[in-house]
Amino acid sequence: LLITSVLVALIVPLAWMLKAPMYQAPNAVATANKPAMGFKEILVIAKNHKPFIWLALGFLVCGFQVVFLGIHLPGYLTDHGFSTTTGTVFLALVGLFNIVGTYTAGWLGDKYSKPKLLMWLYGLRGLTIIAFLALPLSTWTIYSFGIIMGLLWLSTVPLTNGIVANMFGVKYLTMLSGIVFFTHQIGSFFGGWLGGLNHDIT
């Protein structure tokens, strides 16, 4: 707790640097004098933009999947006779390989089409889940599933934010990424709640 308190306290002096003048690119002079749109105007544009809606819905499913697996898979493994250590190692593998997957997704997003990469990512995630359910449950399949899902876990985030920036520009990235992330959290809620409800009913 002491270390955490020190790290949190460091935010105050570091935030002072945010008072520096905002950098303005040379080609931004033409747009600098345009009046900034408010939240309502941006929201109207976004809700009428079908690719943005589909992107948000995809992120909703992403939230459902990661929370459903993160919360309920360890209990599912225990119900099928595996030790709690197996579930712990699964989550550790997801967390470890998530670092690799997220970094790699961001790097690839700079070089290739972000929408296509995101499509492949969601597709591979779906196929991985189907394969896990179809194969016999063993320590090998559980750990392999953890590694692959870790690579695909939050690698959606840099690609999704990059697509939002490409759609509307970086000026409104924070606002619109927040809206997309809100749908992710809605999916997360249902992933946790419906999984527990199904367990209690069945």
Task: Give each language-model segment a name.
Residues 1, 59, 91, 95, ...:
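Small-residue-rich transmembrane alpha-helices and their cytosolic helix-loop interfaces
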